[in-house]
Amino acid sequence: MSAVSYSMHRTTTTTSSSSHGGVSAGHAAEEFVASAEREKQEMQQLNSRLEVYISRVRQLEDRNKELVIELDTLRGSLGNDIGQIKFKFNDSLVKVRREISEAHSGTIGVEVKVDRLRDDLNDYRHRYEEARREVEREKTTWGGAISQAQAELDTNKSRYAAILDEEKRLYAEQDQLYLQLAAAKDELDAAIVDRRRLQAEEDDLKIELEFLGRIHSQEITELRTLLAQAPADTREFFKNELALAIREIKAEYDKIIQTTRVDLETIFQSKISAVESSIVSKNEAAVFRQEEIRKMNESITTLRAKLSELEARNSALEREANTLQIQLGEDQRAYESELHKRDNALRFMREDCQTLIAELQALLNTKQTLDTEIAIYRKLVESEEGRFTHVGQGVVVAQQETTRLVPVEQDHWDSGEVQTRSSFKRHAKGNVSIVECDPQGKYIILENTSGSVAEDVSNFEIRRVIDGVQAFVFRLPSHLVIQQHGHLKIYGRNSGGINSPPDSIVMESHPSWGQGGQVETFLYNSHGIEKASHIQTTVASSR
């Protein structure tokens, strides 16, 4: 039996996080780093245990070689003393069985450790999702605050524009009031001019009245003189007539004077009243307008103070918004960096788990091979209690290759020859094919042979037929895509696989894919059309 060499590679990634966001995301990142450190220590311990296990397997291999050499020597030198040989190697077989049992116990411990690591990985994934949701919530909160600040800024800008429009309107109204005040002053000047003109007319009428009085007095004097020069009877006649005429003239003169005076006083009083009422109304309007202007000036001063305050607040809000934008960008970059680091860490952990599972599978295969050899040795020793006839040596171990039968070794003894052969054939219609089916029913591998197109295998069906009887049908989950030159490994529930789409998934409905002499595997698309098949035949013969 040839020696088997094993190598383990462990990649440890230490992540560090820097958060400018909330406290929850930073705390989650610190927990993730601490968990990664704990996982590294656990993986180192697991690595040490696997090294011890591998060294024990190598010791078993060396011991097996020694037993094979001793068995060959005994076969060449002894004939009928097979009972002594059995007695001689009974202790060795018991010891080997015990060591194999201990190795199997170690393997179970490794499987338990792998399950625990899988649970830890799911826990880390859950923590990562919680941290991501926390970051999203904080991003939404900051976005709402920025939107509110932006809305308040827009409101302040609109209020500022309204204040500017109000200021322009007040300035225009002030100019209109100044124009009305100038017009009122012009009307006042015109009223003063009219008053002075009427006073001048009154003075002229008074002078004219005085002049007419002097003329009438002179005429009366002349008439009296004439009356004195006339005879008595004539004088008496004219005296009465003259007195009557004088009374009539005086009455008419007084009437004219009174009428003129009343008219002049009425006109003058009406003019004066109109001018005074106009002046009073204009003064009241001017006072009201001055009061309005004063109030407007005070309002403008207040609005300017508020505007300065709003501008300062606007500047502060803009600075805060810029700071929030910068902080949000830094948080986004830190989040993306942390997400990238965690993706890398998860990918490395997944690769390490895949490596450990592959090595564990190799160890299990080696253990199975050792069990087969020990069973053959036991059967050989028990069957050779009588006469031992050496025919040949070899162990047949059938391993699956791509398209050919693989006989490894053969054992011959007097009871006959046992030989196991496996072969398979496959075909595919399209880019997706069944590239491998584990003979022990642990997994099935699908492959996308295209180098440019990703294949969607959502809701595809895998039908398994074992020894002519359909075992079961498994439907692939939705949203499952195989990338270019990618593989999809589908494990049974108890086959030690991990659920990590799109690289590998676990069939939870059955513990394994089953095994038998004639195993047929078919792949159907979602419309029930056959896309690929894999037929594996295992033949065991003895003679």
Curated annotation (Swiss-Prot):
PROSITE patterns: IF_ROD_2, LTD. Residues 89-223 are annotated as: Coil 1B. Keywords: Coiled coil, Cytoplasm, Intermediate filament. Residues 39-388 form the IF rod domain. InterPro entries: IF_rod_dom (IPR039008), Intermed_filament_ifa/ifb (IPR016451), Lamin_tail_dom (IPR001322), Lamin_tail_dom_sf (IPR036415). SUPFAM superfamilies: Intermediate filament protein, coiled coil region, Lamin A/C globular tail domain. Cytoplasmic intermediate filaments provide mechanical strength to cells. Not essential protein. Component of the terminal web (organelle-depleted, intermediate filament-rich layer of cytoplasm that underlies the apical microvilli of polarized epithelial cells) in embryonic through to adult gut cells. Correct localization of filaments requires let-413. This is Intermediate filament protein ifb-2. The lineage of its organism: Eukaryota, Metazoa, Ecdysozoa, Nematoda, Chromadorea. The gene is ifb-2.
